[in-house]
């Protein structure tokens, strides 16, 4: 559960991301694909090379979903319900992959925002991404 301080940290950190959300989302996907090759399984039709249009487009989708979630921290289940249905019932993404993407996103944010990525912000973002992952996997049962 995100505390008031966590929510404040998440909103402030995501605000620093600003217009870079889509490129950071794509970079996080690239990191995940390179670091955890089994995650490529769900993207057999994508060109997964560096800078590909498909990875950029999917990175933008990830970033848009996270931006929406940041704007609705008090109702993540309601906000992400459609995405949860999609990933559980249609795409059947391995729940572990959300943790791997979360890790890759944290590394990406730490790389681009080193002065703002304090231990407290890191912890708050980690909790937030864990909550998002929990919501996205909640309909797998």
Swiss-Prot record:
GO CC annotations on file: blood microparticle; haptoglobin-hemoglobin complex; hemoglobin complex
One annotated GO biological process: hydrogen peroxide catabolic process
Tissue: Red blood cells.
Sequence positions that bind O2: 58
Phosphotyrosine: residues bearing it: 24
Family: Belongs to the globin family.
Residues with Phosphoserine modification: 3, 35, 49, 102, 124, 138
InterPro entries assigned: Globin, Globin-like_sf, Globin/Proto, Hemoglobin_a-typ, Hemoglobin_oxygen_transport
PROSITE patterns: GLOBIN
Organism listed in the record: Odocoileus virginianus virginianus (Virginia white-tailed deer)
GO MF term set: haptoglobin binding; heme binding; metal ion binding; organic acid binding; oxygen binding; oxygen carrier activity; peroxidase activity
Subunit and interaction comment: Heterotetramer of two alpha chains and two beta chains.
Modified residues (N6-acetyllysine): 16
Protein's UniProt keywords contain Heme: yes
Name of the protein this chain belongs to: Hemoglobin subunit alpha-1/2
Function according to Swiss-Prot or TrEMBL: Involved in oxygen transport from the lung to the various peripheral tissues.
Residue positions binding heme b: 87
Record-linked Pfam families: Globin
Domain Globin residues, every copy: 1-141
Key words, A-Z: Acetylation, Heme, Iron, Metal-binding, Oxygen transport, Phosphoprotein, Transport
Keyword Ubl conjugation part of the UniProt annotation: no
Residues modified as N6-succinyllysine: 7, 11, 16, 40
Modification type Phosphothreonine: residues: 108, 134, 137
């Amino acid at each position: 559960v995100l505390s008031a301080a966590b929510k404040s940290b998440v909103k402030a950190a995501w605000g620093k991301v600003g217009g870079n959300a889509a490129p950071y989302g794509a970079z996080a996907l690239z990191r995940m694909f390179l670091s955890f090759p089994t995650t490529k399984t769900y993207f057999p039709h994508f060109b997964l090379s560096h800078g590909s249009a498909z990875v950029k487009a999917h990175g933008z989708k990830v970033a848009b979903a996270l931006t929406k979630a940041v704007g609705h921290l008090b109702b993540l289940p309601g906000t992400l319900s459609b995405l949860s249905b999609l990933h559980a019932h249609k795409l059947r993404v391995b729940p572990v992959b959300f943790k791997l993407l979360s890790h890759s996103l944290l590394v990406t944010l730490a790389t681009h925002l080193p002065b703002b990525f304090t231990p407290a912000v890191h912890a708050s973002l980690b909790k937030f991404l864990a909550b998002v992952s929990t919501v996205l996997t909640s309909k797998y049962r």
